[in-house]
Amino acid sequence: MNKLTINACPLCGGAHLKRAMTCTDFYASGEQFDLYTCEDCGFIFTQGVPVEAEIGRYYETPDYISHSDTKKGAMNAIYHHVRQYMLGRKARLVMKESHRKTGRILDIGTGTGYFAHTMQNKGWEVEAVEKSGQARNFAREHFGLNVRPEAALKELVPGTFDVITLWHVMEHLEHLDETWELLRELLTEKGVLIVAVPNCSSYDAMKYGKYWAAYDVPRHLWHFTPATIQQFGSKHGFILAARHPMPFDAFYVSMLTEKHKGSAYSLSLIHI
């Protein structure tokens, strides 16, 4: 398997990289991956992840709910209830930050299409992109959405979107600088980019350490703080307009983390 080796910090270009911790893939493989930090700017990333063309199998599990939409188990049931509330909250956030009740929106990494469907129902013209064929099929069958594969991003007309959203997507994308540049090109002159990412400087991340579910190796390649996500935006011509917490996302991640800690304890007992 071909793996991505990072020798220079994607944010500042620095070469002073240090291993920070080792995390486990609790979803698909049980494999371990190292997290590295840039000693110059503090940016954190996962080292040695499979390259983009080969990472697909790490998403192919029913436990990866944003692609499978499974409702089995208490954790997934909670996810579905929380999502219903968050869909409305996200829609209100889009309209507040864009100062628009309708417009043209691009949802990148749309998953099974719930958010794109919500915005469509509110009168927005929606384009949606998703790398998972399984998730694209679900969105088409359940919502009638024409969800394009990820490669279609480069086929979209520049300067035509009032809003672009990436809900927990940026941390998955291998070509980070290229993505930021493309986002800037696709937006209208006064367009708004909304990016939601886990905060690896949060209380929960500090508390749980290597068990924190939002490290989600190897699917999460990049691990942002409020400072580093803002620095990436500034690097590519974006100005930070607002910052919003997503407490229900954090709550769900903490529940997954507790489950992971239980799994690790059980595995250690079996090993003994």
What are these regions (language model features)?
Residues 1-73:
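N-terminal juxtadomain amphipathic helix
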Residues 3-7, 17, 85-209, 221-236, ...:
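Conserved SAM-binding loop
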Residues 24-29, 241-267:
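Conserved catalytic loop of SAM-dependent methyltransferase domains
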Residues 34-35, 63, 141-145, 163, ...:
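Short low-complexity, flexible loop/linker segments enriched in glycine and/or proline
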Residues 39, 66-71, 147-152, 163-173, ...:
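Short, structured secondary-structure boundary patches
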Residues 72-75, 208-217, 256-263:
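Short glycine/proline- and charge-enriched loop/turn segments
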Residues 74-90:
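Conserved SAM-binding loop and adjacent beta-strand
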Residues 270-272:
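Conserved small/polar residues in nucleotide/adenosyl-binding loops
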